[in-house]
Design a protein with these regions (language model features):
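Substrate-binding groove/exosite segments of carbohydrate-active enzymes
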Residues: 84-89, 103, 155-198
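Beta-strand-rich interaction surfaces with strong enrichment in secreted/lumenal proteins
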Residues: 81-84, 94-99
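Residues that cap or initiate secondary-structure elements
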Residues: 3, 113-117, 172
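Gly/lys/ser-thr-rich phosphate-binding loops in alpha/beta enzymes
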Residues: 86-88, 95, 106-107, 122
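Short Pro-Gly-centered flexible turn/kink motifs
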Residues: 97-115
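Polysaccharide-binding surfaces and accessory modules of carbohydrate-active proteins
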Residues: 1-76, 91-93, 118-162
Length: 198
């Protein structure tokens, strides 16, 4: 997980390594770093099926001297159930699945962002209000729901990007003008006055 500012996260270790905090509930990891003290938002990572194990600390998942290219948990065949209290939180879910030749199986993973009003942050002391997270996970719980959401997103961007269209005979120029230039204008519009692009 990024702790809301990727540049700061990669350099301000004396602070960041003392703030990481998560909750785990079934196959859902809630990243709530600084939620108690100064934030009204948290991240949520989930799978739409039961998990066999999980990790929420980078050292437990990757190994103390390991990295994401060859994580210790993957080599071991399972995660350790680590709960982050400081250091570097991660969201790792392990689902053991055996498929017969030609068989397929769908598993949906989701990563979301939730904001709660100040007066609705907690449901009990230290327990974050997960009502909005549960509603979001219910909206994307099946293949059909995810396919419908992707189709709606595709339609939105196609409509947005189809207002102006160039056919120059030069494929790369067409792509730059028809997609990336317009997309960059939209990103600039949405992110203007933002202190961070992370």
């Amino acid at each position: 997980f990024c702790l809301w500012d990727a540049v700061d996260d990669s350099s301000n270790f004396q602070r960041n390594y003392s703030t990481g905090e998560v909750e785990v509930e079934g196959s859902v990891i809630y990243h709530k770093t600084e939620y108690r003290e100064r934030r009204n938002h948290y991240a949520v990572f989930w799978a739409n099926c039961p998990v066999d194990s999980f990790d929420t600390t980078r050292d437990a998942f990757c190994g103390v001297y390991g990295g994401p290219a060859d994580p210790q948990a993957v080599r071991a065949g399972h995660c350790s159930g680590s709960i982050a209290h400081g250091w570097a939180p991660v969201g790792a879910l392990h689902i053991h699945l055996t498929l017969a030749p030609g068989e397929s199986h769908s598993i949906l993973f989701g990563l979301g962002y939730i904001e709660n009003p100040q007066q609705e942050k907690f449901i009990a002391p230290g327990i974050i209000n997960k009502t909005r997270a549960h509603a979001m996970m219910e909206r994307y719980a099946t293949d059909a729901q995810v396919d419908a959401a992707r189709a709606a997103l595709r339609t939105h961007w196609e409509q947005l990007l189809s207002t102006y269209h160039l056919e120059s005979g030069e494929e790369k120029l067409n792509r730059m003008v028809n997609i990336w230039h317009q997309y960059q204008c939209m990103v600039t519009f949405n992110m203007s006055r933002s202190a961070s692009y992370y």
